[in-house]
Amino acid sequence: MKFIDEALIRIEAGDGGNGCVSFRREKFIPKGGPDGGDGGDGGDVYLIADENLNTLIDYRFEKSFAAERGENGRSSDCTGRRGKDITLRVPVGTRAIDNDTKEVLGDLTKHGTKMLVAKGGYHGLGNARFKSSVNRAPRQKTNGTPGEKRDLQLELMLLADVGMLGLPNAGKSTFIRAVSAAKPKVADYPFTTLVPSLGVTRVDTSRSFVIADIPGLIEGASEGAGLGVRFLKHLERCHVLIHLVDIAPIDESDPADNIAIIEGELFQYSEKLANKPRWLVFNKIDILSDEEATARAKNIMQRLGGEDDYYLISAATGKNVDVLCRDIMDFIEENPRQEQEKIDAQEVKFKWDDYHQEQLSEQVFTEDDQEEDDWDDWSEDDEEGVEIIYKP
C-alpha cells in the first residue's frame, strides 16, 4: 500500500435543530397551551487512533465528512432527535491541525485515543420554553446554532525510539536490515529509500526498540533539494537520533563536510529537533583497516572540534553493531519517554440552564401587552406570526 503521511480534509459538525411553535389541540380543549418541543443537538466529528492503519491514503480520495443535523422540535413537547456523530479512523501517531489557523488540535499517540475535532451545534428552544404567567400563548422560538466547520490537516508522524539521519547511501537501510527484520530496498545509487520505514530491534528476549529510517538529506534540502525535509517530522518523537556517516565516501567527499551539511539542514528545519540527543556513527569501516578507520575518525572529530564520542561500525558485516544496539537500549531505558500530560477535558462553558435562561430573559412582557384571552390558542390568521429569536 502506498505510504501517505499528509491529507487535507473538510469536516462539518451537524447544525442544531430548530425549536417548534405549536399549541395543544384536543377534543374539548380547543385552546390548549404551548407544546412546541426543542430541537436536537447536531452530531460531532471525532478522530480515533487505530493501530491497524499505517497510512492516510483513505483521506486522499474522500475529503469531505459531515455529521448529521439535529432534527427540529415537534408538537406535543417532542424533542428533535440528536444528529449522529461520525468517527474517522486514523493511524496511531496522527496529528490534527486546523488548516486556517495552524492550531494543533492534538496528537493521537495511543491506540484507541479519541479526539473531538468539530463540535455539533446546540438545539433551539420550542415555544413551550417561553411560557410564563404573563405570556401564556408564546409565539417565540429559537433556531439551533451552526456546527463547527473546518479544514483539517492530518499529518502522520511515525512513533519510533530511534531515528536514522544521514546523506543518501550512508548505509541507513543496510543498518536497519542488519538489526531488525525490516527489509528496505538497498542499492548503490542515491535515494534508494523514498518513504520512511520502521524496524524493531531486539536486544534480548525482553528488550527491544523501534528504529525509523527516512530518505537521505542533501545540501539544500530545507529549500526543497532532493526529497526535501518533509520526512524529518517522523523523527520528532524519537528518543535519540543516529547520525550515520560514510567514513570513506565513494565520491571522495569530506566526511566532516557531510556531517556539517546534515547538522545545518536539521537546524534549518527545527532547532528543537537539532537539539535532540544525536550520536555520531561512522559506517563502512570494513573497507578500511582498523587502524586507518580509527585514525580517520579521530581526524574528522578534531576538525569538527568535537569530543571522541562516536562509534565505528560496519552495517554490512555487523561489526560493532551489537555494541551500538545495546548502548541505544540502555540509553532509552535510562531516559524514558516523557508521557504527555493528561489534560482533563475542559469543562464545557456552555451550560444548558444558563443558555435557556438567557434566551428566555431576552423577552420581557407586561400585563398591558396581553389580551384577556392571551392564553388562548394561536390563530393562523394572526398578522404578527411567529417570532424567531436569534442569538446575537
Swiss-Prot record:
**EC numbers, comma separated:** 3.6.5.-
Q: Name its co-factor(s).
A: Mg(2+)
Please list the GO biological process terms of this entry: ribosome biogenesis
Q: Which GO terms describe its molecular function?
A: GTP binding; GTPase activity; magnesium ion binding
Pfam families tied to this protein: GTP1_OBG, MMR_HSR1
Q: Where is this region: Disordered?
A: 361-392
Alphabetized UniProt keyword annotations: Cytoplasm, GTP-binding, Hydrolase, Magnesium, Metal-binding, Nucleotide-binding
The record's InterPro entries line, in alphabetical order, gives: G_OBG (IPR031167), GTP-bd (IPR006073), GTP-bd_Obg/CgtA (IPR014100), GTP1-OBG_CS (IPR006074), GTP1_OBG_dom (IPR006169), GTP1_OBG_dom_sf (IPR036726), OBG_GTPase (IPR045086), P-loop_NTPase (IPR027417)
Q: CDD domains given for it? A: Obg
Q: Where does GTP bind?
A: 166-173, 191-195, 213-216, 283-286, 314-316
This protein's major location comes to cytoplasm
The residues that the entry says bind Mg(2+) are 173, 193
The OBG-type G domain sits at: 160-333
Location in or out of the cell? Cytoplasm
Q: What class of enzyme is it?
A: hydrolase
Asked if Kinase is a keyword of the record, the answer is no
Q: List the disulfide bonds.
A: none
The Obg domain, residue ranges: 1-159
What exactly does this protein do? An essential GTPase which binds GTP, GDP and possibly (p)ppGpp with moderate affinity, with high nucleotide exchange rates and a fairly low GTP hydrolysis rate. Plays a role in control of the cell cycle, stress response, ribosome biogenesis and in those bacteria that undergo differentiation, in morphogenesis control.
Quote the PANTHER family the UniProt record gives. DEVELOPMENTALLY REGULATED GTP-BINDING PROTEIN-RELATED (PTHR11702), MITOCHONDRIAL RIBOSOME-ASSOCIATED GTPASE 2 (PTHR11702:SF31)
Belongs to which family? Belongs to the TRAFAC class OBG-HflX-like GTPase superfamily. OBG GTPase family.
This protein's name: GTPase Obg
Q: Which organism is it from?
A: Histophilus somni (strain 2336) (Haemophilus somnus)
In the UniProt record, what gene is named as encoding this protein? Answer: obg
